[in-house]
């Protein structure tokens, strides 16, 4: 019976352990935190967006960070396989808007508990509060791991599934990259992905906590369009966040890395309406509220807190009577409604990112087995690999698929 050590008890590590045990290996999971699955507990705002109910190509499309590398892993362990595994072990799931799959209970804890139940039933040993500092090798193969306390765990195969470098309080502190680097693996430079953006626009503090739905946000760099997303966003005390902002953050991080500093976010507040139709809508509202001041004449069009900001960008006096607004002023107003400008200064720190971009280079990993090309018996799974996707369950699916494939291959090492 092969002995397999899994370093990390997150989504990828738990699936790797389950797969290895299912295929006959003696498995030990070494988790540095007191409890496994801590990052899983905070995903999907504590609800755990398990995966996405879409086809393979759509999943790959939504993992812009080396998604094609995952083609084999995603075929070997699909989104349907994830859902079936959880359902078969007592966890009911549901599909929400955008194909996002959640537990019916809306509790991430139930997902973690189900995965731990699977490991228990398969006889997997789980050791917590233990820090792996070195993967031990002999000539061309791995032979085990060494911990911070000096304890050695012998193994025929080691799966590094220690996560990325975001949310270090959950154990995802970049330690997996150090293990790989010590073994000679190339680490693609780390940067935040799925991270809020910072802004120095003066009105940001006034909009803190304001959520916008069904808007189109577009990133521009020195006037050139870089990326665009439709959906929901949120103004914060430091800038902007929310699903579409997180999706755009990868583009912003890349622009910043390329020393692009003139970055703006233009928000189309009414993307369903063309310029002409929106202008007609504004004109109807102005006719209805012709005797009111401009600030009060737009209450049917925008959230109250947003109106002064829009009027300011359109160079309009909020106290001016609606019936005195000229055609030219109305056009200026519509231009801002179709492109509210937010100056972007940067991203929040890597530690606050939902996902880490960068990691162990995919050029040194076999895509069909997730085995290291440098060492026999060494495997990688999850966020430690240089893969990252958008919000919507794609990153967890990547973790589950790579974990399952690495675990299966390691069992036969």
Question: Can you annotate each of these PLM segments?
Answer:
Residues 2-29, 406-411:
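N-terminal Rossmann-like FAD-binding beta1-loop-alpha1 element of flavoenzymes
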Residues 5-7, 30, 132, 145, ...:
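Short hydrophobic core segments
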Residues 21-45:
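Glycine-rich FAD pyrophosphate-binding loop
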Residues 34-36, 41-42, 50, 56-57, ...:
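An anion/pyrophosphate-binding glycine-rich loop and adjacent beta-alpha core
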Residues 47-95:
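Glycine-rich active-site loop/strand segments that organize a redox cofactor
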Residues 76-157:
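Feature captures the FAD/FMN-dependent oxidoreductase FAD-binding
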Residues 127-130, 134, 308-388:
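A glycine-rich dinucleotide-binding beta-alpha-beta segment and adjacent secondary-structure elements
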Residues 153, 157-203:
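Glycine-rich loop(s) and the adjacent beta-strand/alpha-helix scaffold that form part
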